[in-house]
Amino acid sequence: MRGPKLGAPKQDTTYKNGKILLSAIAGSIVGNILTPGIGGLIFGGIAGGTLGASNKKVTNMAKIPVFYSFHFNNDVMRVQQVRNIGSIEGNPPTTPNEWERLKRSGDRAVQNWIDQNMKYKRCIVVLIGTETATRPWVKYEIEKAWNDGKALLGIHIHNLRCPRNGTCRKGANPFDTFTFDSGAKLSSVVPCYDPSSVSAYADISNNIAGWINSAIDNKRN
């Protein structure tokens, strides 16, 4: 596999706030037509801005298609717990036998499988165990996601209890292994969350939808 090569991050955008502003302006115009004067402008602007913000909230209620990137051998049982959270639409789980058969087919087969399963996903969620940051296919998925303009985020899952092995040692941030030409790390623009050690599952369950929405809204690629 070739070495990581990332496109430079974009500057922060005000696009989402601009949409609300446009809604407010449109509301002011309509309000002034219906009720000429300052009162109509103010009322219409407030109504339009509120509608723009509420439309964004309604959109966020739908399940967002995501791709889970993780170290299969070590963390598949922990990842399954995340899959069971109903608010997220993840890529279909692969059984150990299917994964081994895919790997035996060669690197090209694995890459094609990743490319096809990632194609229509809006966000790539890297679920980080002890050795995730060193895995070649995780690195490929991160690089591809960034260069394809998809949202990215990481979640440490070492405190989720695997039925076989319990919890595990916290792994490194995989986004630290990517460096832009400027010298900045990918981790400087991609969020990585470390859930509570006391209630890791509840923390992830309560927040993952919001984390994903935030990653999509604020992505820099």
Walk through the language-model features, giving the residues of each.
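C-terminal interaction surface of TIR/SEFIR-family domains
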Residues: 63-67, 163-221
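Residues at the C-termini of beta-strands that transition into short coil/loop
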Residues: 94-97, 156, 193
